[in-house]
Regions:
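Sequence-level motif detector for i,i+2 pairs with an aromatic at +2
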Residues: 1, 15-17, 189
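Intrinsically disordered, low-complexity, positively charged segments
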Residues: 1-7
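Exposed, interaction-prone extracellular/peripheral surfaces
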Residues: 8-13, 22, 31-67, 74-267
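N-terminal low-complexity, intrinsically disordered segments
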Residues: 16-26
Length: 267
């Protein structure tokens, strides 16, 4: 049984569950309510950092990540699961302890809105925040939880693998790589100005060598993240900003649900 809340005493309540501290403070009898712990916590790690503030189709990656996380959180709420996790944008983060129903859902949705990038976000130097965030999540999560990671996973350092392994060792982890189609394949032949908020460059996709290197760079990144997930038993999905979020998640999570021992939340 898990503690849920305190409310005013009602006839028929078990006197053994009286909250004497609140009763003494308010001068009126109060009792503790408990609920049977049927479902495990569902936690989210949502990346809204500088590299996620990019998009050429439909929406920025950060917006698609928030949409996907919100859909999964609503499904978890409808399933009776507790919702929590970490929403981070570079070195800033908001940590939310798992809570049931609206007490978990609403603060999480608010964090997804509040942490969205505004204006031009300069690229950050260093990637130690990834190590710190994964370490925080691995320390906070209770064994047996369902964990969703939503990010483009750019800047994920090798040092983060230890925390990732710790997280995946005793939890069901689903990693969702968010990307824009222009990241996966170079746009039509031409010269395109690029900027990360600090530096400027021109991409010449008319050069076949450049176009091939561009495509291979994304494929190598995607394959490296997939390999990391597979090494530690984490399910891996990709979600393009041009894809319908509910249908893409549903297809990917149905495959995950069929794996032996896997249980997940489907929107």
């Amino acid at each position: 049984m898990e503690f849920e809340e305190v409310r005013a005493y009602q006839p028929g309540d078990d006197i053994r569950n009286m909250d004497w501290r609140v009763t003494a403070r308010t001068g009126r009898p109060h009792t503790k309510l408990f609920q049977e712990e049927r479902e495990r916590p569902v936690l989210f790690l949502v990346d809204l950092g500088p590299s996620m503030a990019f998009g050429t189709r439909v929406a920025f990656k950060s917006v698609v990540a928030a949409r996907a996380a919100a859909l999964l959180a609503w499904a978890a709420r409808d399933n009776g699961d507790r919702i929590g996790g970490i929403v981070f944008a570079g070195k800033r983060h908001r940590e939310l302890r798992p809570a049931a129903r609206e007490r978990g859902l609403l603060p999480f949705l608010k964090a997804l809105v509040d942490m969205q990038p505004t204006g031009i976000m300069p690229a950050e130097t260093g990637n130690g925040h990834w190590v710190d965030i994964l370490r925080r999540l691995a320390s906070a999560v209770r064994p047996g939880s369902l964990v969703f990671l939503l990010s483009d996973f750019h800047g994920l350092p090798h040092q983060a693998e230890q925390s990732f392994a710790r997280l995946a060792a005793h939890n069901d982890v689903v990693s969702i790589l968010i990307f824009d189609p222009v990241e996966a394949a170079a746009p039509p032949a031409g010269r395109y100005p690029l900027s990360d908020g600090q530096r400027f460059a021109v991409l010449d996709t008319g050069d076949p060598t450049v176009a091939d290197a561009y495509r291979n760079r994304f494929a190598s990144h995607r394959d490296a993240v997939r390999a990391l997930c597979h090494r530690h038993g984490s399910h891996f999905l990709t979600l393009a900003t041009s894809q319908p979020v509910p249908e893409t998640l549903r297809r990917g999570l149905i495959v995950h649900h069929r794996r032996p021992g896997a249980r997940t939340t489907r929107p």
